[in-house]
């Protein structure tokens, strides 16, 4: 497709330069603009596009397509947000002056290899649907204009069209839509004619009946997700959407939501790749201070993933989930690139005797001035038969329901296979509500088996109605495993603490935070990504506080936005 990316070949006659990512608003390059983070080229003659990094320490090919073109006019927010994430990641590389590594050098020597990964590829055909006419014929009107369907409803509908499920919905829903200033409701007890909904609606080539069927589906998805409709965009919460796909559309309750921030790049890519390999498109989301975005990942080629943006095929193509190599993921702290990205796994037709797939995670927090950061222990030397003690805090519930079940500390080998439990099983005395956290200090532990190279300690959990134990993972910066005996020094997990940024909330609801340098804006999010509050703090202050007494009890995310990057931490109210 693209034979070469050498500078002298970047203005070939059959390509069109359409955008340089050099500014906050992603404007077209001007003579006095700083070095762009990336360049976008369309292939005019045959179709397709390529996004090339403007930084040689980043991966060369950020995104490409051999069919669809990249249009910058009226660019949807989810695409703009993704490009901004590329730009932020590349800026972080430049700020810390990262040297070239061998892997990146080799990628730049032969970037065309990115486009020829046929032995490691998968593509699922999903609907090229949009948010406007004919998809929004049932959407509510505001000042006489139809609102868009919303990216969450569109992603839901694309998944449902692929599954061709449900046959008939169940029940009804009614809620108050703030932007519409009225109650919206509908019954889902209707037949969905999947064959009567084309995978692509081309102007002049679909019937009124086909338009009516898809717009009804979109509206039902919006009502199920409790969409907040607006003329400039409609929004909904992913967790609400998934819970109500289970409730109203007969999807399996084993579906679950994972956050990008809990995993390293290789593990995350493999999770998404395995889902697609198993013929399951992924609802993928991300958020920034301006809102949340949802789209579909329905394929991969090598390390690139095929994105259906839900805008009628606009800008669909293969995208890197990170502009950075795995070795560069720690550059600049957590940054905003992976911020609040999530993926919905296991969306499938309801199965008998299935159970919920609960998710527990570690997050950092303060309690009476003491910082808890996942797992910690009172020893650095482990001897078979000798007792030691561990702390485990905070453990947060990120499931689709309140958690009931058990916890235990386990010794596992270097392959992640459990050798033995080293603590008593902790049975939660009370239900752990969704969005709440709990801690367990001073847990007595003893290893009885022979200690081998690569052994480590994990905390495991099991739901009350499940048979399997799962590992508790955690946000970047938390300690999710304790190395008992080293095997490979590079395998030791170290907490990321590049800046002094922490927050705690007292019993009266007063939030106190230690801020990084140069904070321009502070945002409080719910755990599902909704922006609850935004503040502009005084410049150059190190400690900041505000009352959160009116917020309900739960886990919240505090985001600090600086000129260079964004930081986040969680706090419990």
Residue ranges and their predicted role:
Residues 58-234:
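Active-site-adjacent structural segments surrounding the nucleophilic cysteine of cysteine proteases
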Residues 341-367, 485-512:
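Residue-level detector of functionally pivotal "anchor" positions at catalytic/ligand-binding pockets or at interdomain
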């Amino acid at each position: 497709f693209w034979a070469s990316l050498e500078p002298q070949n970047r203005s070939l006659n059959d390509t069109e330069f359409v955008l340089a990512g050099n500014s906050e608003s992603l404007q077209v390059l001007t003579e006095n603009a700083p070095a762009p983070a990336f360049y976008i080229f369309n292939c005019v003659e045959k179709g397709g596009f390529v996004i090339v990094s403007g930084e040689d320490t980043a991966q060369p090919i950020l995104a490409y397509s051999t069919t669809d073109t990249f249009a910058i006019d009226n660019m949807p927010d989810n695409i703009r947000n993704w490009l901004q994430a590329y730009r932020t990641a590349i800026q972080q590389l430049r700020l810390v002056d990262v040297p070239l590594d061998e892997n990146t050098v080799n990628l730049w020597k032969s970037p065309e290899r990115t486009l020829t990964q046929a032995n490691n590829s998968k593509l699922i055909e999903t609907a090229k649907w949009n948010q406007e006419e004919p998809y929004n014929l049932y959407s509510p009107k505001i000042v006489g204009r139809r609102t868009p369907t919303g990216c969450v409803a569109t992603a839901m509908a694309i998944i449902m069209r692929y599954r061709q499920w449900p046959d008939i919905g169940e029940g009804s829903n009614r809620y108050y839509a703030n932007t519409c200033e009225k109650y919206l409701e509908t019954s889902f007890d209707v037949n969905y004619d999947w064959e009567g909904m084309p995978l692509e609606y081309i102007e002049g080539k679909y019937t009124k009946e086909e338009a009516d069927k898809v717009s009804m589906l979109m509206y039902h998805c919006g009502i199920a997700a409790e969409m907040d409709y607006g003329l400039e965009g409609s929004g909904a919460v992913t967790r609400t959407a998934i819970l109500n796909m289970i409730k109203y559309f007969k999807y399996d309750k084993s579906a679950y939501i994972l956050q990008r921030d809990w995993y390293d790049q290789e593990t995350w890519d493999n999770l998404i790749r395995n889902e697609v390999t198993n013929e399951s498109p992924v609802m993928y989301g991300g958020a920034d201070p301006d809102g949340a975005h949802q789209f579909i990942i329905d394929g991969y080629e090598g390390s690139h993933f095929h994105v259906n943006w839900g805008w009628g095929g606009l800008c669909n193509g293969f995208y890197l989930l990170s502009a950075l190599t795995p070795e560069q993921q720690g550059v600049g702290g957590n940054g905003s690139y992976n911020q609040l990205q999530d993926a919905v796994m296991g969306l499938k037709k309801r199965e008998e005797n299935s159970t919920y797939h609960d998710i527990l995670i570690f997050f950092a927090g303060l309690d009476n001035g003491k910082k808890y950061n996942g797992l910690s222990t009172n020893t650095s030397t482990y001897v078979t038969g000798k007792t030691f003690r561990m702390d485990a805090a905070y453990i947060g519930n990120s499931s689709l329901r309140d958690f009931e079940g058990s916890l235990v500390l386990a010794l596992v080998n270097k392959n992640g296979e459990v050798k033995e439990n080293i603590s008593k099983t902790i049975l939660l005395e009370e239900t752990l509500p969704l969005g709440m956290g709990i801690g367990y200090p001073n847990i007595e532990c003893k290893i009885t088996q022979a200690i081998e190279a690569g052994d480590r300690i994990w905390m495991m959990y099991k739901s009350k109605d499940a048979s399997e134990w799962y590992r508790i993972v955690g946000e970047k910066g938390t300690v999710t495993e304790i190395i008992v005996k080293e095997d490979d020094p590079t395998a030791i997990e170290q907490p990321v603490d590049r800046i002094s940024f922490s927050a705690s909330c007292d019993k009266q609801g007063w939030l106190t935070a230690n801020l990084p340098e140069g904070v321009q804006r502070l945002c409080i999010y719910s755990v599902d990504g909704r922006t609850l509050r935004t503040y502009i703090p005084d410049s150059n202050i190190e400690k900041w506080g505000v009352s959160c007494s009116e917020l309900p009890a739960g886990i919240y995310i505090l985001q600090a936005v600086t000129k260079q990057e964004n930081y986040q931490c969680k706090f419990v109210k």
